[in-house]
Amino acid sequence: MFFERHSGGERTILVHLEGQDPEAREDPQEFQELAISAGAETVAFFNVPRHRPTAKFLIGSGKVEELRDLVKVEHIDLVIFNHILTPSQERNLERVFECRVIDRTGLILDIFAQRARTHEGKLQVELAQLDHMSTRLVRGWTHLERQGGGIGMRGPGETQLETDRRLLRVRLRQIKGRLEKVRSQREQSRRGRSRADIPTVSLVGYTNAGKSTLFNNVTKSEVYAADQLFATLDPTLRRLELDDLGPIVLADTVGFIRHLPHKLVEAFRSTLEESSNSDLLLHVIDAAEPDRMLQIEQVMVVLGEIGAQDLPILEVYNKLDLLEGVEPQIQRDADGKPQRVWLSARDGSGLELLEQAIAELLGSDLFVGTLRLPQRFARLRAQFFELGAVQKEEYDDEGVSLLAVRLPRIELNRLVSREGLQPMEFIEQHTLQ
């Protein structure tokens, strides 16, 4: 990793700002789970009433003094705030406590740094970390000078802070360039799957909802799965044959969480695009979680950030083995389409219902027909050919292209909407023979 992060086992105080809304009241438990996931040794948990935040410390001076005394008595190494701190607040608190202080964003970034396993995942975490820490350079990043390209780069009369900032900008450009190549490779892979008419189904959901366990059971894979937050960061794709549909590609991606740092969403955009470019999303929900409605809302917020909120979604209520009196089942909407599936990824009950629901949704969402494309839509015509969706082409007496196509309806809608039009404006009533 490009810069040092705190190691596990540090003696830690957790500071939570109490709010009035239900979401804030439920947050302390998740905050403690995050700290455990990071490897912190929690010595004390502080609930601070959230009245009027102060510009200097965020919390009142009385609480700051109380925390300072506890830090000294308990020999605390780290204080973590379950709230976003400004760089100046972080520095002011560190001066008073004489120990390290990080906020919720820094904590989540640290967990991601520990969980990343692939080269791409590590680059994405590093990008988010550096972006977050760029506003905190006043701490004195003299260690940046030791990184690749540091020696010999300092200009005459340049301060250490200026050098650190310049080195940071260079490193950020390097990482973004590498991730752009990864993004391009992923796009090529997606185009290849689309040309082969293989739909992509992505697992999304709140962290620790059981996505990777479900993925492993369905695909007979051995992706890392554990009862911990953010066990999976790196996307995994597997080809799967469904009896009533044929081949699909199933993708397992990073889990979401409340107040997921925007920097992480941006850094992991190439990974999250596996979801936003899918034909169907499986929203995995922990059915045994009392707070699941808030978790569902947060997942929808992140899907909105990556442009995936309008994709077809099948809700998958997992962990049925932890509930009593609930059987595996498919629940349908008023039109009879599968809306949610209840199952247990751990013991495998209900998996056949999930496959049935996927086959129903994807099979009914294929468009097979003829499109009428005048010459001014040559670019749109080329895109259908690029996707491998064209089965036959003819021209009418006016030189208008008649394309017999077969592709997911959502893909048709996506391509046509880019032209500011509706699919019905192109659909020919008479199919080609």
Residue ranges and their predicted role:
Residues 14-18, 45-48, 80-82, 283-286, ...:
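Conserved beta-strand segments of the P-loop GTPase G domain that flank and frequently precede/overlap
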Residues 26-36, 41, 64, 68-73, ...:
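Conserved C-terminal guanine-recognition region of P-loop GTPase G domains, centered on the G4
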Residues 18-23, 53-57, 115-120, 159-160, ...:
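Flexible beta-alpha connector loops of hexameric P-loop NTPases
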Residues 106-128:
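Short alpha-helix plus adjacent loop in nuclease-associated cores
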Residues 1-109, 424, 428-433:
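N-terminal accessory targeting/assembly segments
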Residues 18-22, 50-52, 84-87, 106-109, ...:
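Conserved nucleotide-binding/hydrolysis micro-motifs of P-loop NTPases
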Residues 1-14, 135-209, 215-216, 290, ...:
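C-terminal-of-GTPase-core extension/linker across diverse P-loop GTPases
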Residues 3, 186, 193-199, 217-248, ...:
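Switch I (effector-binding) loop of TRAFAC-class P-loop GTPase G-domains
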